[in-house]
């Protein structure tokens, strides 16, 4: 994929391991996927979803938090103190894989940037996502952009 999943590290000391991989190894056995890892100003934010695509529960997040804490304590990758936040993706969930766009087909997504737009996800064709933007279709190659869900489905997907 041309664009890595969202891992952001801003300011404060050097992080000595791949936090994405560390978190992924901690939560994958729990049936969870990592959507985002962001470290900034003493906070490590982790957003997760269930692999079975059912809604994530507070119990899922609590268990994931315990497993992530254990992995962080074992590896000690972040110098100094920090706060761990483990969350569900929420209403502005990131979309960046083929599976994400297929799962939320028919819903609106926001693509940020200078030429950004909000459009309905029509379909995935090959390596492209096709959006309906006004009266026209726009195609973007998966892995070259990021998007966020701009509306929430009536039923869990």
Curated annotation (Swiss-Prot):
Official protein name in the record: Ribosome maturation factor RimP
Record family assignment: Belongs to the RimP family.
Keywords linked to the UniProt accession: Cytoplasm, Ribosome biogenesis
Organism: Thermus thermophilus (strain ATCC 27634 / DSM 579 / HB8)
GO cellular component: cytosol
Biological process terms in GO annotation: ribosomal small subunit assembly; translation
Pfam family membership, one: DUF150_C
Record function comment: Required for maturation of 30S ribosomal subunits.
Gene name as annotated: rimP
UniProt-annotated location(s): Cytoplasm
């Amino acid at each position: 994929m041309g664009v890595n999943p969202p891992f952001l590290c801003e300011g404060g000391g050097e992080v000595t391991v791949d936090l994405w991989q560390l978190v992924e190894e901690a939560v994958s056995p729990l049936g969870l996927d990592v959507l985002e890892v962001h470290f900034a100003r003493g906070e490590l934010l982790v957003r997760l979803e269930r692999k079975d695509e059912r809604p994530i529960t507070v119990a899922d997040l609590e268990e994931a938090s315990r497993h992530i804490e254990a992995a962080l304590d074992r590896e000690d990758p972040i110098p100094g103190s920090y706060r761990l936040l483990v969350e569900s993706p929420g209403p502005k969930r990131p979309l960046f894989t083929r599976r994400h766009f297929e799962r939320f087909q028919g819903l609106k997504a926001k693509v940020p940037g200078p030429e950004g737009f909000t459009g309905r996800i029509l379909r995935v064709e090959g390596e492209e996502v096709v959006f309906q933007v006004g009266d026209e279709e726009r195609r973007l190659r998966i892995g070259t952009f990021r998007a966020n869900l701009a509306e929430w489905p009536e039923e869990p997907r």
